[in-house]
Amino acid sequence: MGHVLSFTHCKDAPSTASSTPDSCPPEGEEDDSPVTEVNFWPLPSPHEPTFSYITIGSTAPLSRPPVRARRGLGQSRVHAAPREETEEKEVKDVVTYVLLEKTCQLKKLSPPHVQEEVVFVAKPQPQLEVFRAVKDLLYWRDILLSAGCLTGVTLSLLCLSQFSVISVFAYGCLIILSVTLTLRLYTKLLHALKRGNGANPFQYYLDADLKLTTKQAEEITARVLSLLSTTICTLRSLFLVEELKDSLKFLVIIYLLTYVGAVFNGITVLLLCVIGAFTFPILYKQHQTQVDHYVSLVSKKGNAFRSKIQGTVKKPPAKQK
């Protein structure tokens, strides 16, 4: 703690050259004025104060020494206990005032702003979820689900190859409804015999949320319209020969499809595609090294043949002598 100078002001004098009077009060009078603090900056008044004594201490008012009667007057000694109690009370009042002032200043301060860390979690996109589900289905991650899908699609295509679409749809709905209705009646019977709770065995699928929000419907509609418009524009450029090279490639592909159509119909082609989709991924996963080796050999042969053809076509004719 730093120290400051505390002074007791007695009287003003016109000059500092005059003698300093006695700091004790005159006879029969007691000085009850509190001890004051004097600023160290120059006083604006031309008069210079004189001081009886200098004390080095803290910023709080200091206690004065007990006042004694001047010698030769025969007065009794003045008791200093009441003055000390008064000065201690003044010190407590000053400390209380300072604490209240600091409390008011702290209340005026704004509370500290705690910046919370915001973690952004990437929302899974519907396209990625659909792609992951199809991949799991084709790689037989869930054997029962993959086997059920393959069997159902294969039987549906075989039925379509023999019957009309309306007949296949009607018989398929009858088969599904007969299975679900039988299971539901069975659970009701168990509940009547007090062997079950009678809950719907398909409650899990009934609780599944299949509704599309407005935003999802707009996204799907925009995606379908974009795909449709892109397909129409591509077919227009191919049929109207916007690029000669692309139109010739399209012509070759259509010509090869005529031979495929002569051997297979559309249902048979779809059936082969479905069987291949559920078969080739798992076979490739089991024999990946051998398949990659043969594929690299075929690609090298194809690149060599292509470079040979391009060299023959771009070879300039020999100059005649």
Curated annotation (Swiss-Prot):
InterPro entries found in the cross-reference section: Reticulon (IPR003388), RTN1-4 (IPR046964)
Annotated Reticulon domain residues: 134-321
Any GO BP: regulation of D-glucose import
Segments for region (Disordered): 1-36, 65-85
Membrane topology according to the record: Multi-pass membrane protein
Record key words, sorted: Cell membrane, Cytoplasm, Cytoskeleton, Endoplasmic reticulum, Membrane, Sarcoplasmic reticulum, Transmembrane, Transmembrane helix
Location relative to the cell: Endoplasmic reticulum membrane; Sarcoplasmic reticulum membrane; Cell membrane; Cell membrane, Sarcolemma
Transmembrane residue ranges: 163-183, 250-270
Gene Ontology cellular-component terms listed: intermediate filament; sarcoplasmic reticulum membrane; T-tubule; terminal cisterna; Z disc
Main location: endoplasmic reticulum
One Pfam family from the record: Reticulon
Record function comment: Inhibits amyloid precursor protein processing, probably by blocking BACE1 activity. Enhances trafficking of the glutamate transporter SLC1A1/EAAC1 from the endoplasmic reticulum to the cell surface. Plays a role in the translocation of SLC2A4/GLUT4 from intracellular membranes to the cell membrane which facilitates the uptake of glucose into the cell.
Protein name from the UniProt record: Reticulon-2
